[in-house]
């Protein structure tokens, strides 16, 4: 007799979060434009393109940056799609391969007016084109440009470290893992785009309470993502990079016990976030208005990422809204067929990287879902 699948409950970490779902009115047009822009670089084969469209990272940007103007929504869509392509390419590489891809994308950001070499991985040209438009939206001396480049560099370095950990099967403690995850999640460069057009004073940006808000926003996003994606990552053998699995091993808990532990941890982060918002210093009426827009941007990122998790096909296929309502998940065995998007091999991905590619999919409640 086949054993019944493990069933567990997903907590609603944002049940009492003051910021509610908000979708930008510019979503349809920006999705059309950004999808066409991304596809113009031919990053995936036909199967991979289906996976890319199912994820709908344009929806993520339109939820996360929803309070902002059209230009930021479009830049946000492009940035999310760059993240996806970069992650897909580095996911099939070891540390050395990921480091080479990192060098390409960072050189493109730092030298956007330098033509990219013929035959180079397409992430370089994607980053170059994006950064010319993004940097042109603000003054050349805007602090947000420096913040973005610094944070994207930190992000790519952390992704390389994760790739090396993956190749070596490194098992980290939760605190050590969370420290890396804060960088590898890509939240900080995503938050940097929230600054564009606000001209925040450095005093406000670097204030300890503001720095804490960025870290707490990242933690809420990362922990929520780990809980929601655990079943999928477990089935794919990637649970070493998920806090649920790490807590299971650190504290000797079962899956639900580990999720409950993380729920309590996230509740503390949530309380600290609200405390920092309530006790932010004043820098005068005009600056305070811009600071509020920035804080709303961070908070909307937390809310928007959670909404996107269930509204896109990234983690739950077409059952996301059902899972969001019932909060019940089942962990079932992996199948051998992959629905994951794949980097297009010919002319884009070096053959030496392709050997690291892993095919997998799984079933939740009898339906296929896209692998992370």
Curated annotation (Swiss-Prot):
It catalyses: (2E,6E)-farnesyl diphosphate = gamma-muurolene + diphosphate; (2E,6E)-farnesyl diphosphate = delta-cadinene + diphosphate. (2E,6E)-farnesyl diphosphate binds at residues 314-315. Mg(2+) 1 binds at residue 87. One of its GO terms (biological process) is isoprenoid biosynthetic process. Its EC number is 4.2.3.-, 4.2.3.126. Keywords: Lyase, Magnesium, Metal-binding. It comes from the Eukaryota. This is Sesquiterpene synthase Agr9. It comes from Cyclocybe aegerita (Black poplar mushroom).
């Amino acid at each position: 007799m086949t054993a019944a699948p493990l069933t567990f409950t997903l907590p609603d970490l944002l049940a009492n979060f003051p910021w509610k779902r908000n979708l930008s009115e510019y979503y349809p047009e920006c999705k059309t434009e950004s999808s066409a822009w991304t596809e113009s670089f031919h990053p995936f084969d036909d199967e991979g393109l289906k996976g890319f469209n199912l994820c709908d990272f344009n929806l993520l940007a339109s939820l996360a940056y929803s309070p902002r103007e059209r230009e930021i929504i479009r830049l946000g869509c492009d940035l999310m799609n760059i993240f996806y392509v970069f992650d897909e390419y580095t996911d099939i590489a070891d540390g050395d391969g990921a480091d080479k891809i990192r060098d390409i994308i960072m050189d493109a950001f730092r030298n956007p007016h330098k033509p990219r070499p013929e035959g180079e991985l397409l992430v370089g040209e994607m980053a170059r084109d994006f950064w010319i438009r993004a940097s042109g939206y603000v003054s050349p001396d805007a602090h947000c440009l420096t913040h973005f480049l610094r944070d994207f560099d930190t992000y790519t370095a952390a992704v390389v470290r994760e790739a090396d950990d993956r190749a070596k099967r490194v098992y980290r403690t939760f605190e050590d893992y969370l420290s890396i995850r804060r960088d590898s999640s890509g939240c900080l460069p995503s938050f940097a785009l929230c600054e564009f057009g606000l001209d925040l004073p450095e005093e406000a940006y670097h204030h300890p309470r503001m720095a804490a808000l960025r870290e707490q926003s990242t933690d809420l996003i990362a922990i929520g993502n780990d809980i929601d994606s655990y079943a999928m990552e477990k089935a794919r053998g990637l649970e070493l990079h998920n806090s649920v699995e790490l807590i299971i091993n650190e504290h000797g808990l079962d899956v639900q016990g580990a999720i409950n532990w993380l729920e309590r941890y996230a509740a503390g982060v949530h309380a600290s976030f609200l405390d920092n918002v309530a006790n932010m210093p004043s820098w005068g009426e005009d600056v305070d208005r811009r600071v509020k827009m920035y804080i709303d941007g961070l908070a909307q990122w937390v809310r928007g990422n959670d909404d996107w998790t269930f509204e896109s096909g990234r983690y739950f296929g077409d059952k996301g809204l059902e899972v969001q309502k019932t909060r019940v998940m089942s962990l079932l065995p992996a199948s051998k067929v992959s629905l994951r998007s794949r980097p297009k091999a010919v002319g884009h991905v070096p053959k030496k990287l392709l050997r690291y590619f892993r095919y997998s999919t799984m079933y939740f409640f009898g339906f296929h879902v896209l692998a992370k």
